[in-house]
Amino acid sequence: MLYVKKYLFFVTYLCTLIVYAQDIDVFKQYYGRYSYTAIGNTLNPAENNIYGGFCEILPESSANFNLTPNQNIIAAYLYWAGSGYGDTEVTLNGININADDTLNVEFDDSNWGVLTYFSCYKDITTFIQTNGSINYTLSNLDISSVL
């Protein structure tokens, strides 16, 4: 029994040493009864695979956005991500979109070295409120320098 207690103490102690995290802040908060709708797509013609031929992406990708007449748009954001430090300017339905913010993360892979990834977002609430239920096409995401 003494060994079990020592073992549990040791494991608990180790768990406190190997936990890494960052602070999380609320981005936006809405009060009331809201539902959530998301649409999305990919520019990847195949599954991501570091060992395979993944070095080409599609030039554009589309998704249909449909709202019923009784639904209102409170907020809308465009998110995009990929490999590298980031392409902060993309095109949505022919309109240039510049990121409000870009976030980067680096993953140190024992076989491939440091792999860098990015994610960007843009508040497009007015754009979506104006255009409503249509087909949205994202294009001009350029990550060719890292493929």
Which residues fall in each region the model found?
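Disulfide-rich extracellular domains of secreted proteins
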Residues: 21-147
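Bacterial Sec-dependent N-terminal signal peptides
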Residues: 1-23
